[in-house]
Amino acid sequence: MKKRITYSLLALLAVVAFAFTDSSKAKAAEALPLYYLQITGITSDGNDFAWDNLTSSQTKAPNVLKGNKLYVKARFMGYTKLTVITGKDGKNLLYNGTAKMFKSDAILGQNKVVIGWDKYFEIPMDALQDNSIQIKALSSGTTFVYSQKIDFERE
């Protein structure tokens, strides 16, 4: 008899818990392919990591960059399959481990659905082709989306 009452109470508890579950807290949606990519910040290890914010129309870093490591913040809107930062040898610095993504922050849209990412990259300046940086990312199929190219002066 005790077992029957225990099972009945557990079943009732499960029904009540299910009935009061708020399904609006977590939403899943099909990810949009990458449609926007912008470099939004730049700094270096010799600049005490003081970020210069960049707009989409800027093509030059406002301050001279010092040190050996370049730090870039980029905004990715939509889902990306592959990110490319090209080095002197024409190869992807992220793939070969020369550069690395060290942080990412989700960008939330309506109903707390992730719609993009702010990603932070560390790149050795000597590995770049010249004193400039541009990021490209694979959106869907074979379509690449490009950020603006940012030139910088180096001390």
Curated annotation (Swiss-Prot):
It comes from the Bacteria. Residues 1-28 form the signal peptide. Keywords: Signal. Coiled coil: none annotated. This is SPbeta prophage-derived uncharacterized protein YolA. It comes from Bacillus subtilis (strain 168). The lineage of its organism: Bacteria, Bacillati, Bacillota, Bacilli, Bacillales. The gene is yolA.
